[in-house]
């Protein structure tokens, strides 16, 4: 869902001169690095996986975002740590977009360091530095702090938008996000 709203957020940033900061959230942190099929992830919850994928594809098309036929979910912890590192560079937003595309379009496993390094390079950031960031887990504590912050805010789903002391949960329409920032 975070990927779905990237275009909306970009339009708001341009229109209002916003600065956006990401707080990472532990969505399915129990997912093994090898991943889970979507059928395994949603087993026993009564979801029609094909219907879910078709709906997501339609929503992505409306937003003019590429979207693949994703069959698995993967542990995103290392990707979050890499994203946190990327925040200190102008290319950080590009890194986030490339991570979303690798996952939602290409179906790549973001728990695999080589995938993350390829994505880093595609975002024009240093592959060598990123390798150290991943190997040494240099942003583990920063992501742990994000997870605590999300928990303290009562976040239970993604994306969650916070502006001032108000928040919205879910892939909200542009107009709802605009109202959130105008109510500041």
Which residues does each PLM region occupy?
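C-terminal cap of thioredoxin/glutaredoxin-like
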Residues: 1-18, 22, 84-184
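Structural alpha/beta surface segment adjacent to cysteine/selenocysteine redox centers
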Residues: 3-106
């Amino acid at each position: 869902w975070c990927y779905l709203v990237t275009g909306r957020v970009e339009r708001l940033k341009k229109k209002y001169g916003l600065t956006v900061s990401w707080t990472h959230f532990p969505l399915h942190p129990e997912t093994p690095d090898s991943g889970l099929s979507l059928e395994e992830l949603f087993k026993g919850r009564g979801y029609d996986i094909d219907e879910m994928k078709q709906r997501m594809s339609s929503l992505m098309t409306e937003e003019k975002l590429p979207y693949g036929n994703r069959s698995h979910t993967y542990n995103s912890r290392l990707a979050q740590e890499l994203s946190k590192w990327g925040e200190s560079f102008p290319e950080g937003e590009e890194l986030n977009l490339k991570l979303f595309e690798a996952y939602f379009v290409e179906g790549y496993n973001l728990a695999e360091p080589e995938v993350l390094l390829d994505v880093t390079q595609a975002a024009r950031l240093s592959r060598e530095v990123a390798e150290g960031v991943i190997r040494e887990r240099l942003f583990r504590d920063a992501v742990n702090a994000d997870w605590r912050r999300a928990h303290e805010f009562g976040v239970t789903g993604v994306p969650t938008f916070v502006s001032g002391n108000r928040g919205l949960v879910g892939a909200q329409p542009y107009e709802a996000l605009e109202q959130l920032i105008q109510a500041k």
